[in-house]
From Swiss-Prot:
Native species: Hamiltonella defensa subsp. Acyrthosiphon pisum (strain 5AT)
GO MF: ATP binding; metal ion binding; nucleoside diphosphate kinase activity
Gene symbol of the encoding locus: ndk
GO CC entries: cytoplasm
Name of this protein: Nucleoside diphosphate kinase
InterPro entries noted in UniProt: NDK-like_dom, NDK-like_dom_sf, Nucleoside_diP_kinase, Nucleoside_diP_kinase_AS
Protein family per UniProt: Belongs to the NDK family.
């Protein structure tokens, strides 16, 4: 199996619920190492640049309002098949459709406030990691 890196955001509503530690425990239990992390308050410009591929979608405005409503916790995760593994533990985008025991089922409230963002491919992971992290801020362990 290939060791990969993926990108994750714990969204503002989940941050305000004080579940960062619980989510980090789930990452580590799933053998996803946290190799870099930051807490940020995204500007509208940062959020629009990050989610640029959704610019023409109906939900774009709500997404930007939600992701900039408070601090986010961003992290780089590393492990075997990290992109797929992270997507599996996150669960479906809509927390109401996510399987019990997944992060979104346990910590998400709605389609917009679904607790987390995770890269959907290796190419996305590379782009998203580079958007927020410098090379010398990431430490494999």
């Amino acid at each position: 199996m290939a060791v990969e890196r993926t990108f994750s955001i714990i969204k503002p509503k989940a941050v305000t619920k004080n579940v960062i530690g619980a989510i980090y425990t789930r990452f580590e239990t799933a053998k996803l190492k946290i190799i870099s992390a930051k807490m940020l308050l995204l500007t509208i410009e940062q959020a629009e640049g990050f989610y640029v591929e959704h610019k023409n979608r109906d939900f774009f405005t709500n997404l930007i309002q939600s992701i900039t409503s408070g601090p986010v916790m961003i992290q780089v995760l590393e492990g075997e098949n990290a992109v797929k593994r992270n997507r599996e533990i996150m669960g479906e985008t809509d927390p109401k459709k996510a399987l019990a025991g997944t992060l979104r089922a346990d910590f998400g409230d709605s389609l917009t406030d679904n607790a987390l963002h995770g890269s959907d491919s290796l190419a996305s992971a590379e782009r998203e990691i580079a958007y927020f992290f410098k090379f010398d801020e990431i430490f494999s362990r």
